[in-house]
């Protein structure tokens, strides 16, 4: 479907994007929604405080922990997870709205949430996004300018573990060039995909990244 074309047909599958922090899944998600009218971004709920540039309802639905827990206990979340000390979740209403409009819901969530969605949303497509190198990942994390070195190191350690979960996803995309990564994810969304993007075929790339992260951490986080 071309940009700005008609909406996706009824039953358009949801697209679940997961990645280590700094791999670029949010940039890919935003590009899909900005370019194609048949995509709807799923705004997550979170207990994390808003950053200076973030807007309620656009980046996240920011809420207190008691309100989040009440929503979860009422069965109003498709998935939820605690990440880096904060709770994140996907409101059921996001998927309902997308299905009513015949749109692909684009979910930008962590690997814990993706696992829960796998059990609940049978027609969703799951994509794991990788950085092109461990050095690039470190650079992106540091380039945010909002995290202390110890936080970046913790995220790098978490990234190494999250990459192990990539084999549970349908496809793996390496975000070495944003436009190309967006094109690959779009192809996956509409079912026009290269077999080489299957997770099982990317095992060598995943293992190389993990090994290099191990090296960086053992060198005292000096990348």
Predicted regions and their residues:
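NTP-dependent small-molecule kinase module
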Residues: 2-4, 146, 164-223
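Post-Walker A helix-loop "phosphate-sensing" segment adjacent to the P-loop in P-loop NTPases
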Residues: 34-42
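P-loop (Walker A) phosphate-binding loop of NTP-binding proteins
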Residues: 18-20
């Amino acid at each position: 479907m071309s940009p700005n074309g008609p909406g996706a047909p009824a039953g358009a599958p949801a697209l679940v994007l997961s990645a280590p922090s700094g791999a670029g899944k949010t940039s890919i998600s935003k590009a899909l929604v900005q370019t194609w009218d048949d995509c709807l971004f799923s705004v997550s709920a979170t207990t994390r405080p808003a950053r200076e540039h973030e807007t309620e309802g656009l980046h996240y639905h920011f809420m207190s922990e008691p309100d989040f827990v009440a929503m979860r206990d009422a069965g109003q979340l498709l998935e939820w997870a605690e990440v880096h000390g904060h709770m994140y979740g996907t409101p059921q209403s996001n998927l309902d709205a997308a299905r009513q409009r015949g749109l692909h819901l684009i979910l930008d969530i962590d690997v814990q949430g993706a696992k829960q969605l796998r059990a609940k949303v049978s027609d969703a497509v799951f994509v794991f996004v990788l950085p092109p190198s461990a050095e690039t990942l470190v650079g992106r994390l540091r380039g945010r300018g909002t995290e202390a070195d110890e936080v970046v190191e913790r995220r790098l350690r978490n990234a190494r573990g999250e990459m192990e979960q990539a084999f549970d996803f349908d496809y793996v995309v390496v975000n070495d060039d944003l436009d190309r990564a967006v094109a690959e994810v779009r192809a996956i969304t509409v079912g026009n995909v290269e077999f080489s993007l299957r997770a099982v075929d990317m095992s060598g790339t995943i293992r190389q990244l993990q090994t290099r992260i191990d090296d960086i951490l053992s060198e005292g986080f000096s990348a």
